[in-house]
Each structure stands twice: as structure tokens, then as C-alpha cells.
Amino acid sequence: MYIHMFAFRWKPGVTGEQKQRVITGIRQLQGQIPGLVETIVGVNISPRGRGYELGGVMKFTDKASLDAYAPHPVHQKLVSWLMPLIEPIEVDSEI
């Protein structure tokens, strides 16, 4: 198994509606990306978040699935409208 972890800082001016659209969009990737078996995303409640307000974990069956995730057309469609809204940090790991 492999995991993709992420956290986002919102850029100035991002609305609550846009934030909810991001959460919904990420959750909808599951079932559309081969090998993506679990998606957890939520609002950060930690006082140690350093400005990162949204975080999540995605679990993939294997390295090939993880590698195929980023260029997948469904993911790229999300990225096209998501990136102008966020300052992301990402970590991938084998578990």
C-alpha cells in the first residue's frame, strides 16, 4: 500500500463555498481513479497547523496506482481549478 498525504493553505479571498467545493471534489476522486481505495479529507482542528487548514490522506493499492494518480485526467481536471486557490504541501509514502 502507498499513501498520498496533503495539506492546503488557502490563498487570500477563497470563499467558504470554494472550500466546500474542494472537499467535495477530492472525495469524488475515489471510484474514478484506479487503485485509489480510500480517501480521507477534512478541516484541520489542530492549533499546531501552521496555517494549513485542510488536510487529507489517500490510500493506493500499489506504487503504479500512486504514480498514475497525478497525471490522470480526472485529477488534472480538479487540479486545473484547485491550484489557484491553495498553497499545498504533499508527501507520498509506502506503508
Language-model segments: residues:
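A cross-taxonomic marker for long C-terminal extensions/tails that follow the last structured domain
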Residues: W81-L85
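A common structural junction motif
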Residues: Q28, V74-S80
